[in-house]
Each structure stands twice: as C-alpha cells, then as structure tokens.
Amino acid sequence: MMNESQPKLKYKRILLKFSGEALMGKSQFGIDPSVLDSLARDIAELIHMGVEVGLVLGGGNLFRGKALSQAGVGRVTGDHMGMLATVMNALALRDALERIDLPARIMSAIPMLGVVDPYHRRKAITHLRNGQVVIFAAGTGNPFFTTDTAACLRAIEIGADIVLKATKVDGVYSADPLKNSDAKRYDYLTYKEVLTKGLEVMDSTAICLCQDQGMPLQVFDMAAPKALKRIVTGERVGTIVGANHDQ
C-alpha cells in the first residue's frame, strides 16, 4: 500500500522480463539462490510502493536448445523443453517471494494441473490488482516464439504501462561494449531504429508487437542500485524504446 511519504509513481503496472542466464549469477548453470533472494526483495519494494508486478522469466540457465539442436533434437521439441525450464524458474522465484511473505501466482501457458495455474488474462489482472505478483511461465505456449515475445504479449494483454528488460549491461549499445570500446550507448530509441539498425534489444517479433500496440520498453542493468525503484518513479535508467524519443 502506497502512502503519502512515498514518491509519485510513473508506472503503476509493469511487466519485468528477467533472463534465465541472469538467475545463474556467477555460476555456469542452474539458479543462484542469492540472485533469487535479491530479485524477490526488489520486487517486494515495488509491491509495497503500490506497483503491480508481472514477470516473465527465461529458461537459459536450465536448458540450452542450441546444443540439443546440434545433436539432432527438433526445434519444436527443444522449444517445449525450454518452456518447461521457465516453469522451473518460476517455481523457484515464487518460493523466494513467499519466503518473505509476498503472495505470488504462477500462470502457465501450458496447463500443469496441481503444479501451477493455467494462464487466464482476467484472473491475472485480478491477482495484480490484489497486490499479488504474477509470474507468467511457459512462454506463449507455442514453439518458435521467444520469452521476450511472451513478455511483450503478456504486457499488452494485462494492460501494463511498460516492459522492463533486465540485462547485464546498462542499456542498448551500437555494438557489444565488451568487445568494442567505441560502442555507443543509446538513451532513447524508436522501434524503427531498433529494427533498421539491427540492435539486439529483443527479437524482431517482440519489437514489432510492441510497435503495433504502442508498448514502451526499457532496457536496464539489474545490478544497478535501486534500478527498479528508480524506473517506476520516472528516473531514466538504461535505454528507453518507444514510438519517439520523447517517450
């Protein structure tokens, strides 16, 4: 519940996209419990400010389809396995949230009776309004679509104000800043600029979906101090992608 002493919110309902790789921390595989706990605390701070939080997690920390594809596993099978990996991550995050007494629901695009709830748009919105964190799992439920696209789709469906993509760098660059010291970081980009420049913000399907529906994106470094709190109160952190540079 927000009180008068708290800062004014620019974004009341957000969709946070968190990669599976980010959950590994400094490990090469799996889930780092300290990363989960840190993410849970950051989300709790937003909930206590009155922000409604939906999440989509990737699955790259538990499953890497490229290696299996090279071994002959079909793309559809690999994508389904990746969807299951996102459910595993969602279960871990829900547990971390519940350990700090923050109610959370998992809604999966693939029905898993007795494990998680099936995705239902209207119920998801009700949960958000009631102060529960909603974790959307299993992508879109269809192969050939990334979790970035799933995040944008769910954000549009639930009427989120913005999609926040947490990464390991502080925004979008013209080139890989780890390989090119001349790489330029952008403060603002339009959807068209992202597509024409071939910038690695999200896949083109996700960007086009946001462009068609006017859904803004913000790419930021999850390790930046109080990043989420600063963003929801209107501070520019990282790179903003929208219809124009005045987003």
From Swiss-Prot:
Protein name: Uridylate kinase
Entry's Gene Ontology cellular component terms: cytosol
Pathway(s) the chain acts in: Pyrimidine metabolism; CTP biosynthesis via de novo pathway; UDP from UMP (UMPK route): step 1/1
GO-annotated biological processes: 'de novo' CTP biosynthetic process; UDP biosynthetic process
Superkingdom of the source species: Bacteria
Cross-referenced SUPFAM superfamilies: Carbamate kinase-like (SSF53633)
Primary gene name: pyrH
Family from the record: Belongs to the UMP kinase family.
Catalytic activity of the protein: UMP + ATP = UDP + ADP
EC number, as in UniProt: 2.7.4.22
Catalytic EC class: transferase
